[in-house]
Regions:
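Short, surface-exposed polybasic-aromatic patches that bind anionic ligands, especially phosphate groups
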Residues: 25-191
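Short, charged juxtamembrane terminal tails flanking transmembrane helices
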Residues: 216-219
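Bacterial N-terminal signal peptides that target proteins for export
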Residues: 1-8
């Protein structure tokens, strides 16, 4: 019995250490989507945008622009090129385009707290005020080095920077970039990671083996 427990323990450790995690984003590469005005903000010419499925027209998520100099059009279909941790192919930030422009921690924090409806808890944001949406868009552009001044979003920038510079700061949100190739890349968020199927099979096999062994011992 002791030997079997040791085997199961090894399987469990391998399952957690060796296997990866899957982030269930609302869209994936090759999905076709379109944009529409969410009715919030847009005094900036940027977000907030609604993203809808081009086939069934379901609302998938709401988002904000990352690249100031690239554009999209409403009610026009776009094919998702991929989901990554950086923007590619545009913007004013003169980084190596092949390497892309990684998302800043402050941008991730702002968008995650916006999506989870936590951004108003510090009296930084009013979900019923268009000016708050415009401020958030300006803050995102500034944090991604797309504009030289955050303007009305400066207070969001400073607050987010203070948060992520704290020595005890940790971030468990799932924020990435929806890459659209030559068009405007957008922020996207997903839920907490879930184990891959291979992980579940490995763990299940170990537990099943333990149950089988115990039954044999009891006979």
């Amino acid at each position: 019995m002791k030997k079997m427990c040791q085997i199961v323990l090894v399987l469990l450790v391998l399952g957690f250490v060796c296997a990866g995690s899957v982030f269930a984003y609302p869209v994936a590469a090759n999905d076709v989507i379109y944009f529409e005005n969410s009715g919030n903000g847009t005094g900036t010419g940027g977000g907030e945008f609604n993203i809808r499925d081009a086939t069934n027209h379901d609302l998938l998520f709401t988002t904000f622009c990352l690249e100031y100099s690239e554009h999209i059009a409403y009610k026009t279909n776009y094919r998702v090129q991929g989901i990554s941790d950086r923007a590619y192919g545009g913007g004013y930030d003169l980084t190596d385009d092949a390497a892309g422009d990684p998302l800043s921690s402050a941008t991730k924090w702002l968008y995650w707290n916006f999506v989870t409806k936590e951004l108003d808890t510090s009296e930084l944001f009013d979900y019923d005020d268009d000016r708050s949406y415009d401020a958030l868009q300006y803050a995102i552009w500034y944090l991604e080095d797309e504009i030289e001044s955050a303007g009305v979003g400066a207070y969001l920038v400073e607050y987010a920077k203070d948060i992520v510079s704290d020595a005890d700061y940790s971030f468990d949100g799932n924020v990435a970039v929806m890459n659209l190739g030559d068009y405007q890349d957008q922020l996207i968020a997903g839920p907490a990671p879930v184990p891959e199927p291979a992980t579940l099979v490995l763990l299940g096999s170990g537990l099943a083996g333990l149950v089988f062994y115990r039954r044999r011992m009891n006979k």
